[in-house]
A protein has these predicted regions:
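N-terminal loops that bind phosphate or other acidic moieties
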Residues: 1-71, 81-82, 86-187
Length: 187
């Protein structure tokens, strides 16, 4: 493996968007890693040129899409990274953004999770493990909705349909936001 710079990674995201636009693709997927990319690829059966390995750089992707739009964007990622995105982070790397567990506890408490347990958790994975499937789905869906709102705010455009998919470590859908009636995406 050959390491490369953050700026080179972001440039590769930009080139991916350029290729998608040059091929008139109506839908691209920005993923934080292989597990979320594999889930989204199976779900939508899109060509490889529609897959953007954004990694931690959701901000770099969204900023470029402001001036280089694609009609439909799916952002797929792990729970922890999308919690950070829902809280306004645009660089999702652990060294550059952290989860506000107190804020997450405020969302989780009405779902039946103990406020102090969530607020004092060491990781989002710990919260996933302490929640039952219904709580996990509800919390992931709330996080997805807030991440979608954060993406829309950062993107500064209303003409791109945005969907958020929260994917578990084992590749299952935990929650989502952005689907409207009859499976169409809300703008």
């Amino acid at each position: 493996m050959r390491p490369f710079s953050c700026s080179a990674w972001i440039a590769s995201i930009h080139r991916g968007i350029d290729v998608a636009r040059a091929n008139a693709l109506p839908h691209v997927i920005g993923s934080t890693g292989a597990t979320s990319e594999n889930f989204a690829k199976k779900r939508y059966d899109l060509p490889d040129i529609a897959l953007l390995d954004m990694g931690d750089f959701v901000g770099g992707m969204l900023k470029y899409m402001r001036k280089n739009p694609v009609p439909r964007l799916t952002i797929a990622g792990g729970f922890g990274k999308l919690v950070k995105m829902s809280q306004g982070a645009v660089d999702l790397h652990s060294a550059r953004s952290q989860v506000d567990f107190e804020r997450l506890a405020t969302l989780a408490t009405p779902l039946g999770l103990r406020h102090d347990a969530v607020a004092n958790a060491n990781s989002v994975l710990e919260i996933v493990q302490m929640s039952d499937p219904d709580q996990r789905h509800a919390l992931a869906s709330i996080v997805a909705g807030q991440a979608r709102d954060a993406a829309r705010t950062y993107l500064k455009r209303d003409d791109i349909a945005i969907e958020i998919l929260v994917i578990s470590r084992d590749g299952a859908l935990l929650g989502q936001a952005g689907l409207g009636q009859a499976g169409s995406l809300e703008l």
